[in-house]
C-alpha cells in the first residue's frame, strides 16, 4: 500500500463498539439526577394539586352552605310577602289572568342571572382555551428540543400556571357558577309552584326538609356500630336473666356458680310440712321429772333405760298471761308433783303437776314463763277426721334439750288401734289404749310430743312404739279429741273418774277345759269374761249380774277379754249410759243391761 494514501479499516472489520469512545460517566449521573428531580417535582406537584383541589372543594361547600342559607331566608321572606299580598289582593277578587301575568313577569327577571352566568362561562371558557393554546404551543416547542433542560422548563412552566392565582380563581368561579345555575333553575320551579296556592307552597317547603324515614336511615348509617353494641348488651342481659329464672328446683343446680345463696333463699318455696314444723316448734317443751342439774338430758335418758321414764316432751295447749298449760304423757311425769320445764332458748322453770291419768296416759303440768318468750299455744285439730295415709309430722325433743325441736315426718298408718299397755310394769297388760298408728320415727324423749297435720294443728300426742326385733316404723299416738277431754278434766278436777261395775272378772280363753265345762258354755264360746265375784251394792249387782255369768258382748261390741271390757266401760266415762250386754248363764244366752251410774 502506498505511503501517501490514507489507511482505512473496513467497517465490517471494525470490532470495537462505537459508543465506548463517547461514554461519559459524569453525564450519565447528571441525567439520572435530573430524572429523579423531575419525578420528585411531579410527585410534589401532584400532592399540591390534590391539596388545592380539596381546599377548593371545601371552600365551595362553605360557599354553597352560606348561599343556601341566605337564599332560604330570602325565599321565606319573599313567600311571606307573597302570602300577605295575595291575602290583600283576595279582598278585591283578582282574576286568574292577572295572577298568571304576574308570574310570567317575574320569570324573566329571575332568569336574567342565568344569562349573566352563561356569559361568564363563555369568558372563562375562552380564557381557558387561550391558556390551553398557550400551553400546547409551549409543549410543541419544548417537545422539539431534545435537551433535558428544556423538558425541565416545560414542567416548571406547567406547574407555575396550574398553581397560579388566576388558574385557581377560574376553577373556583367555574364550580360556583355551575352550582348557581342549578340553584337558579330550582328556585324558578319552586317559585312557579308556590305562586299557585299557599297550600302547595307549604307542601313544597316541607318536602325540602328531611322526613322521619330519612332521619332514621341517616342515624343507622352513621351509628350502626353503636346500635349493634346496644343490641348485643340487651341480648346478653336477657340470656343471663333467663339463666337465673330457669334454675332447676330439683336440686341439680344447687352448686351452680351463677346461683347465690341469697337468691336461693328468696326463691325457696315453703311446703305445708315446712310451715307446720316451723310453727309447731314454738309450742313444744321438754319435761323432766328429775329436777337435778348434774347430768345432761341424753345421759339421763341413757342411764334410766329400762326404768321409769324421767324425760319427755310436752305440748303447750293453753296460755294464760305468763302461765302455760302443758299436755304430756302420764308415764313421763310419773308420781312426782314437780317437773323441770325447758322452753324457748333453753329457759327453764319448775312446773306443777295438776293431774295425771294412768289409764289414758295423759298428764297436765302448769308453769310460768319469762316475758317476751316465743312460746305459744298450739292450734287444736280434729282427730275424728283423720284419713289413712294422711301426712303428719312428729315434733319433740328426743334425748331432751340436746336435740330439742326435732321434727320427723310420716303418715297415718292405721286408725282405731287398741294397744295393750302395762301400766304398773308387772308384765301384765292393764288397759287397752285407743290410738292411731303412724310410721314417723319416735325416739326416747319424743313421748308427750305433738303429732301435727299439714295445717299445723295438733291431732295427737305421741305416746309409745313397738320396740321389738325385726319391727320398725310402728308408733302410736293418742287422738287429740280424747287427750283434750282428759286434759280439761285434769285441769278442772285434778283426776278422771271412770265407771266401776264392782265385779271381778277373768278371761274365758285362760280357763281350762274343766272350768269351761262346769260353766255349761257351748263349745264355740271361747271369748269373753267370766264373773268371779260381785260386790255388794255395786253397779254390777244393781244391774243383775251374778257370779259365773259370762259376758260375751257389751254395747254391741264383742268382748274378747278383760282389757276390751274395761275399754268399753271407760269409753262411757262422760255419758255413763246404761249399756246393753249379752251373757251366758247356766249355758243359756241372756240379754241384760249394765248400769254405769
UniProtKB/Swiss-Prot annotation:
Parts of the chain that traverse the membrane: 224-244
PDZ domain span: 485-561
Molecular-function annotations in GO: serine-type endopeptidase activity
Highest taxon in the source lineage: Bacteria
InterPro entries the record matches: Chloro_Bact_Ser_Proteases, PDZ, PDZ_sf, Peptidase_S1_PA, Peptidase_S1_PA_chymotrypsin, Peptidase_S1C
Annotated signal sequence range: none
Subcellular location field: Cell membrane
Pfam families (alphabetical): PDZ_2, Trypsin_2
Active site: 331, 361, 447
Compositional bias of kind Polar residues: 71-83, 125-143, 286-297
Chain intervals with Basic and acidic residues compositional bias: 1-13, 21-70, 195-208, 298-308
Positions of region (Disordered): 1-148, 189-208, 286-308
UniProt key word Cell membrane: yes
GO cellular component terms, semicolon-separated: plasma membrane
Keyword list, A-Z: Cell membrane, Hydrolase, Membrane, Protease, Serine protease, Transmembrane, Transmembrane helix
Classification via PANTHER family: PEPTIDASE S12, PROTEASE DO-LIKE 8, CHLOROPLASTIC
Family: Belongs to the peptidase S1C family.
Protein name stated in the entry: Serine protease HtrA-like
Amino acid at each position: 500500500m502506498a505511503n501517501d494514501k490514507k489507511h482505512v479499516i473496513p467497517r465490517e472489520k471494525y470490532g470495537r463498539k462505537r459508543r465506548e469512545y463517547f461514554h461519559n460517566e459524569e453525564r450519565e449521573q447528571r441525567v439520572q439526577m435530573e430524572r429523579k428531580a423531575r419525578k420528585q417535582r411531579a410527585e410534589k406537584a401532584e400532592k399540591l394539586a390534590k391539596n388545592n383541589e380539596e381546599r377548593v372543594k371545601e371552600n365551595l361547600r362553605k360557599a354553597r352552605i352560606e348561599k343556601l342559607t341566605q337564599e332560604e331566608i330570602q325565599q321565606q321572606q319573599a313567600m311571606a310577602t307573597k302570602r300577605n299580598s295575595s291575602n290583600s289582593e283576595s279582598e278585591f277578587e283578582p282574576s286568574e289572568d292577572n295572577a298568571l301575568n304576574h308570574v310570567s313577569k317575574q320569570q324573566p327577571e329571575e332568569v336574567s342571572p342565568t344569562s349573566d352566568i352563561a356569559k361568564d362561562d363563555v369568558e372563562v371558557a375562552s380564557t381557558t382555551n387561550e391558556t390551553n393554546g398557550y400551553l400546547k404551543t409551549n409543549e410543541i416547542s419544548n417537545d422539539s428540543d431534545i435537551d433535558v433542560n428544556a423538558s425541565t422548563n416545560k414542567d416548571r412552566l406547567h406547574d407555575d400556571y396550574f398553581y397560579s392565582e388566576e388558574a385557581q380563581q377560574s376553577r373556583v368561579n367555574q364550580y360556583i357558577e355551575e352550582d348557581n345555575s342549578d340553584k337558579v333553575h330550582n328556585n324558578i320551579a319552586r317559585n312557579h309552584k308556590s305562586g299557585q296556592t299557599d297550600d302547595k307552597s307549604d307542601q313544597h317547603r316541607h318536602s325540602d326538609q328531611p322526613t322521619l324515614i330519612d332521619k332514621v336511615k341517616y342515624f343507622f348509617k352513621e351509628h350502626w356500630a353503636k346500635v349493634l353494641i346496644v343490641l348485643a348488651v340487651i341480648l346478653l342481659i336477657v340470656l343471663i336473666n333467663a339463666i337465673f329464672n330457669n334454675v332447676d328446683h330439683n336440686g341439680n343446680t344447687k352448686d351452680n356458680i351463677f346461683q347465690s345463696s341469697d337468691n336461693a333463699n328468696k326463691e325457696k318455696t315453703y311446703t305445708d310440712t315446712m310451715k307446720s314444723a316451723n310453727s309447731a316448734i314454738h309450742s313444744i317443751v321438754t319435761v323432766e321429772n328429775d329436777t337435778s342439774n348434774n347430768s345432761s338430758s341424753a345421759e339421763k335418758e341413757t342411764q334410766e333405760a329400762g326404768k321409769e321414764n324421767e324425760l319427755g316432751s310436752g305440748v303447750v295447749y293453753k296460755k294464760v298471761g305468763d302461765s302455760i298449760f302443758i299436755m304430756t304423757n302420764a308415764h313421763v311425769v310419773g308420781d312426782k308433783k314437780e317437773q323441770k320445764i325447758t322452753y324457748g332458748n333453753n329457759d327453764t322453770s319448775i312446773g306443777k303437776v295438776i293431774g295425771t291419768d294412768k289409764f289414758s296416759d295423759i298428764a297436765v303440768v302448769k308453769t310460768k314463763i319469762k316475758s317476751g318468750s316465743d312460746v305459744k299455744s298450739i292450734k287444736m285439730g280434729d282427730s275424728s277426721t283423720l284419713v289413712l295415709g294422711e301426712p303428719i309430722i312428729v315434733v319433740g325433743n328426743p334425748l331432751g334439750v340436746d336435740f330439742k325441736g326435732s321434727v320427723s315426718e310420716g303418715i297415718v298408718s292405721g286408725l282405731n288401734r287398741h294397744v295393750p299397755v302395762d301400766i304398773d310394769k308387772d308384765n301384765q297388760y292393764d288397759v287397752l289404749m285407743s290410738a292411731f298408728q303412724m310410721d314417723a320415727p319416735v325416739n326416747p324423749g319424743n313421748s308427750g310430743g305433738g303429732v301435727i297435720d299439714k295445717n299445723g294443728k295438733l291431732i295427737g300426742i305421741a305416746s309409745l312404739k313397738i320396740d321389738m326385733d325385726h319391727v320398725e316404723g310402728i308408733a302410736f299416738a293418742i287422738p287429740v279429741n280424747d287427750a283434750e277431754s282428759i286434759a280439761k278434766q285434769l285441769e278442772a278436777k285434778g283426776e278422771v273418774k271412770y265407771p266401776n261395775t264392782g265385779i271381778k272378772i277373768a278371761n274365758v280363753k285362760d280357763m281350762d277345759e274343766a272350768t269351761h265345762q262346769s260353766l255349761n258354755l257351748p263349745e264355740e264360746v271361747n271369748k269373753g269374761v267370766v264373773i268371779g265375784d260381785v260386790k255388794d251394792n255395786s253397779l254390777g249387782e244393781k244391774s243383775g249380774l251374778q257370779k259365773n255369768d259370762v259376758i260375751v258382748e257389751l254395747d254391741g261390741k264383742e268382748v274378747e277379754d278383760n282389757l276390751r271390757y274395761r275399754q268399753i266401760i271407760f269409753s262411757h266415762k262422760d255419758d255413763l249410759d246404761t249399756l246393753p250386754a249379752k251373757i251366758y248363764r247356766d249355758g243359756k244366752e241372756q240379754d241384760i243391761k249394765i248400769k254405769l251410774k
